[in-house]
UniProtKB/Swiss-Prot annotation:
Localisation: Cytoplasm
Protein name (database record): Proline--tRNA ligase
Assembly notes: Homodimer.
Gene Ontology cellular-component annotations: cytosol
GO molecular function: aminoacyl-tRNA deacylase activity; ATP binding; catalytic activity, acting on a protein; proline-tRNA ligase activity; transferase activity
PANTHER family found in the cross-reference section: MITOCHONDRIAL RIBOSOME PROTEIN L39/PROLYL-TRNA LIGASE FAMILY MEMBER (PTHR42753), PROLINE--TRNA LIGASE (PTHR42753:SF2)
Family from the record: Belongs to the class-II aminoacyl-tRNA synthetase family. ProS type 1 subfamily.
Gene coding for it: proS
Length: 618
């Protein structure tokens, strides 16, 4: 395909509003353009990459018996009222009315639609299982769209739904999807982890997230590609090397979530769901009597601990939440942080939010900084982290402004429900006892759920089982963020390309190093001088030969300076560059492997054979 015929509006500079490198490069390299806040047009290069990813998905889903279909994006609100999500989904839901004043939504997800279709068509267990999916645009009214394609108001998603007559059958399909997702993301060239995830608004019971890991850009060997003009990093002057490190560090590490993973086992979880190895300890110290002490101007745990000369681990942090309009007291060891997802899941609450100062004062009789679990009203619900029960003679708020209580002992002075509600910390033991926890940032690219009967119960999707009984259909849900795959791949495969000019100056610029499976084209064929007829003829022959061998070829036939052509080539990021230059009359061309910066001159007649060898090596 001729580059002059494509819409590839590259920019000379990085866009000033981009915070993450994937957003900056997608815009600068001419892959996408923003139409309005959170809404993007996918230009030809991006569309080709997305279509290649769709092909990978379709091939892997065919192996597990998943069947593609297409549901409408414009949905009647009545379906969402059936499931209860019309009122509870929140402000992200696009709501609109037609000319008859009927309520509609733009679908952010399609559980209700697929459930209705199957409910109306399937009456017996003999018609199950069904495994359906679609690839379609979704809509969420994000309050603050950001980071390019990672947080948008319109996005492309693959959502699949499976329907079963029992949980054992669901387990089989769930495992099929887990393996299919691993195959898809591996083929796409992603460094990813399958982690324990939270079902969130989807209502799932068991779930697994697939996170593209976005590591810090500190490893020069990974993030920097040297031109053939530079033998090694050791040849780069120290001051230039420092500039390169600063450029790498200047771009924010993307990733909406933190992953906690074991250094020695397969354990990995979203920080919201991560836990650690817990060993209850026996109390050895004698229990002191309660004593009220004045703690003037002490509002925080560290201030109280310093004032009373105790360690923060000997204090109790007391928080008040409102869960489905009911007050819940949450307790933590003083130096720990609350994990609201764990608390919300334990309470099985639809809504959970921190109480206001006024609500806290009405419940405890004191303001923030002086709250505690002792002498609360009869029937108060207290949920404490499991570490709290190990405390002896702890310090807690006295429910009296400016005062705390010492000698607080769980069990004697208050009763609580003990459960893991804390946020884990790096360096703690993995819950499986193997290795310690480390953190990494990640971009969620896929999520699978065991929905169970969440939607079939609320929407009356039932079948007759083998015994003639009416039972709810058991469901699974499987999503992949198709458009955000482009961001995830670029985040992992962006590179800083460094070269040395004939004058001895060092130059560096960002570009993309696309994995072969997702690159919009396989080969970038560049004619240095389009006015040289010999070079033009050789380019045309090479283009035909490459295409005949199955290569997707982007031919740069533009009448531009060679420097601009090479700069655009680095930005666009195709795996192989073939340059027809000054030696065209001799039948000599240059091959450059984008991933390594290595280049070699070959006879044009040997180009295909050489490429086959080089692509196997890389």
């Amino acid at each position: 395909m001729k580059q002059s015929k494509l819409l590839i509006p590259t920019l000379r500079e990085m866009p000033s509003d981009a915070q993450v490198i994937s957003h900056a490069l997608m815009v600068r390299a001419g892959y996408v353009r923003q139409v309005s806040a959170g809404i993007y047009a996918y230009l030809p290069l991006a569309n080709r990459t997305i279509e290649k990813f769709k092909t990978i998905m379709r091939e892997e889903f065919e192996k597990i018996g998943a069947v593609e279909m297409l549901a409408p994006a414009l949905l009647t609100a009545d379906l969402w009222r059936e499931s209860g999500r019309y009122e509870t989904y929140g402000e992200d839901l696009y709501k609109l009315k037609n000319r008859d004043n009927s309520d509609f939504i733009l679908g952010p997800t399609h559980e209700e639609t697929f459930t209705t279709l199957v409910r109306d068509a399937v009456k017996s267990y003999k018609q199950l299982p069904l495994n359906l999916y679609q690839i379609q645009s979704k809509y969420r009214d994000e309050k603050r769209p950001r980071n390019g394609l990672l947080r948008t108001r319109e996005f492309i998603m693959k959502d699949g739904y499976s329907f079963h007559h029992n949980y054992e059958d669901l387990d089989v399909t769930y495992e099929d999807y887990r393996q299919a997702y691993e195959a898809i993301f591996t083929r796409a060239g992603l460094d990813f982890k399958g982690i324990i995830g939270d079902g969130g608004a989807m209502g799932g019971k068991d779930s697994q997230e697939f996170m593209a890991v976005t590591p810090a850009r500190t490893d020069l060997d990974r993030w920097v590609v040297l031109d053939k003009s530079i033998a090694s990093m050791d040849d780069i002057p120290k001051e230039v090397l420092e500039d390169i490190k600063a450029e790498l560090a200047a771009w924010m590490i993307s990733g909406e979530d933190t992953i906690a993973y074991s250094t020695e086992s397969s354990y990995a979880a979203n920080l919201e769901m991560a836990t650690n190895e817990y060993k209850p300890s026996s109390k050895v110290a004698a229990e002191d009597a309660l004593a009220e002490v004045e703690t003037p101007h002490c509002k925080t745990i560290d201030e109280v601990a310093a004032f009373l000369s105790v360690d923060e681990t000997q204090t109790i942090k007391t928080l008040l939440f409102v869960a489905d309009n009911e007050p819940v007291v949450a307790l933590l060891v003083g130096n720990d942080h609350i994990n609201t997802v764990k608390l919300k899941n334990y309470l099985a609450a639809d809504f959970l939010e921190p109480a206001s100062e006024e609500e806290a004062r009405a419940f405890f009789g004191a303001g923030f900084g002086s709250l505690g679990p002792v002498n609360l009203a009869q029937g108060s619900r207290i949920v404490a982290d499991r570490k709290v029960q190990n405390l002896t003679n702890a310090v807690a708020g006295a429910n009296k402004d400016g005062f705390h209580v010492t000698g607080v002992n769980p069990g004697r002075d208050f009763q609580a429900e003990y459960v893991d509600i804390r946020e884990v910390k790096e360096g703690e033991m993995s819950p499986d006892g193997h290795g310690v926890l480390q953190f990494a940032r990640g971009i969620e690219v896929g999520h699978i759920f065991k929905l169970g009967t969440r939607y079939s119960d609320s929407m009356g999707a039932t079948i007759l089982d083998e015994n003639g009984r009416t039972v709810p259909i058991v469901m699974g849900c499987y999503g992949i963020g198709v458009s955000r795959i482009l961001s995830a791949v670029i985040e992992q495969h962006a590179r800083l390309f460094v070269n040395k000019t004939p004058k001895g100056d060092y130059r560096y610029a960002w570009g993309i190093n696309f994995p072969k499976e997702l690159a919009p084209f396989d080969v970038h064929l560049i004619t240095v001088n389009v006015k040289d007829q010999v070079a033009q003829d050789l380019t045309a022959k090479l283009e035909a030969d490459l295409m005949a061998k199955g290569y997707d070829v982007l031919t740069d036939d533009r009448n531009e300076r060679v420097g601009s052509k090479f700069s655009d080539s680095d930005l666009i990021g195709l795996p192989i560059r073939v340059t027809v230059g000054k030696k065209a009359a001799e039948g000599i061309v240059e091959i450059k492997i984008k991933a390594t910066g290595d280049s070699i001159e070959v006879n044009a007649e040997n180009l295909i054979e050489t490429l086959e060898i080089l692509t196997k090596e890389h």
